[in-house]
Amino acid sequence: MNGKVIVITGALGALGRVVAETAQQRGARVAGVDHAPSPMAVATPERIEFGGVDLSDAKQAKHAIDAAAAHFGRLDALVNIAGGFTFETVADGDITSWQRMYALNVLTALNASKAAIPHLIASSAGRIVNIGAMGALQAGAGMGPYAASKAGVHRLTEALAAEHKGKITVNAVLPSTIDTSANRASMPKADFSKWVTPLELADVILFLVSDAASAVTGALIPVAGRV
């Protein structure tokens, strides 16, 4: 990670914070992008944050990505963590949930990737890592909108990998349930010890960003924890 410049979307969320902190600990310089307001008052040579960014809007995504590249002088990797979740059946749900999941999960990754690609091609080792979902491999009851949108992320990953082979590696990690406070609150009777931790996911994500993963592209990698 030493010296690599990484943009992380969803950087203020439970997973994004851990990935950003771990990347910095390993020597990377990090630009965080999030829909939430950033608590960071002043940028540093190692870290900058862009809060209040709607990545489902292509213009806002491009502005944030270009600003990050300008701050550091280059961009080596994009980690698309921004996204959302909903649980509702097709019969009881509403079309707006499907539209919202598509915007939060597919459009955010699409817009950030499209904005980052010119910068990543200029890097000697451009990387994109997306967050898919094991739940998108086979949707269960109530998982339709979320699973369909994450399946879209899987196909986006494969398309980008094919389009930029030899220039940028593009991969996705597919977690099971992530061990976060929000998930614990919504599933209090679950066995949390079986879930994948944010740090475990960060390790896989940052491997895919690293030089050691130069031969890996177009991969959808399940990170199941102990489920």
Locations of regions flagged by a protein language model:
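Alpha-helical segment proximal to the catalytic Tyr-Lys
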Residues: P118, A161-E163, S214
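Active-site loop-to-helix junction immediately N-terminal to the catalytic Tyr of the SDR YXXXK motif
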Residues: G93, A139-A147, A159, N183
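Substrate-binding pocket helix/loop in short-chain dehydrogenase/reductase
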Residues: T89-V90, S97-Q99, I128
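Conserved glycine-rich cofactor-binding loop
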Residues: L12
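C-terminal helical subdomain
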Residues: G166, A172-V173, T180, A190-V227
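Residue(s) in the substrate-gating loop at a strand-loop-helix junction
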Residues: A133
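Active-site helix of classical SDR
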Residues: S113, S149
